[in-house]
């Protein structure tokens, strides 16, 4: 039986995480509005993320089934390593490809660096909402129901057992882990902004589709390495080490962009 104090502590940690995420998203919206001369770039960034996942997840499921199989691989095994490589590579291909598609079509008037930053903020915000904020809110509701027993009302024994397993897992959340999650989300936002600027540069350079595809190799590779290195080394260096590594890779990507940045041309005048 999970104690009331343990449930309350976990609920507090998730509440802290949800509040910090909301603050991060709202702050990003305010900044994007100032930098992007409105919310259109931010909104298109969000669309780019949703589009990337709508295309990536079915493809990832199919590739995983064909290459890896249906069984969950053991951490550290060759199959697990392959699954991490596939997940990281598809994230890079589909997310950077989606950014390029939107920036070269629907958002083709967005050419300033400020608009690129706003676009990256929108991409990161929707990712944070879907993958972190909504699960945190669900965890808060579930832990609250477990504390007063309402979540178990009228449940059959088998379902109650499965629910208890889930609640036991959620009750392990702590302020420390929540803080690490928020820190990771901040660096992920910085990474998304920087990768967007790389893609924006690639789109601005013109040429045909092959030229654009060739230029996208760099942001795809950077995205893949950021994800791949962190997850692959997680079993070896632990969660704290993995977060430090992710932060270091992100800062390296930012430094590389700054070093290679060319003056971005002014947006083309509207017809």
Where are the regions a protein language model picked out?
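Hydrophobic alpha-helical segments at protein termini of multi-pass membrane proteins
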Residues: 1-271
């Amino acid at each position: 039986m999970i104690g009331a104090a343990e449930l309350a502590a976990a609920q507090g940690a998730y509440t802290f995480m949800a509040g910090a995420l909301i603050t991060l998203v709202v702050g990003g919206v305010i900044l994007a509005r100032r930098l992007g001369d409105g919310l259109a770039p931010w909104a298109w960034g969000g669309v780019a993320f949703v589009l990337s996942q709508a295309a990536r997840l079915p493809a990832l499921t199919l590739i995983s089934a064909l290459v890896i199989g249906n069984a969950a691989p053991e951490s550290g095994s060759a199959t697990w390593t392959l699954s991490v490589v596939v997940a990281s590579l598809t994230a890079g291909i589909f997310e950077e490809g989606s950014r390029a598609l939107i920036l070269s079509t629907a958002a083709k008037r967005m050419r300033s660096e400020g608009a690129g930053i706003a676009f990256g903020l929108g991409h990161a915000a929707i990712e944070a909402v879907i993958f972190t904020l909504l699960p945190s809110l669900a965890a808060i509701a579930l832990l609250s129901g477990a504390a007063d027993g309402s979540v178990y009302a009228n449940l059959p024994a088998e379902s109650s057992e499965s629910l208890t397993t889930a609640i036991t897992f959620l009750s392990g959340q702590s302020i420390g882990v929540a803080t690490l999650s928020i820190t990771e989300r901040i660096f992920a936002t910085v990474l998304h902004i920087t990768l967007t600027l790389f893609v924006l540069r690639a789109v601005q350079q013109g040429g045909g589709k092959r030229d654009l595809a060739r230029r996208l190799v760099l942001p795809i590779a950077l995205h893949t390495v950021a994800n791949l290195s962190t997850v692959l080394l997680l079993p070896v260096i632990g969660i704290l080490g993995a977060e430090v590594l992710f932060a270091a890779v992100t800062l390296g990507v930012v430094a590389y962009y700054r070093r290679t940045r060319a003056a971005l041309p002014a947006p083309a005048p509207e017809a």
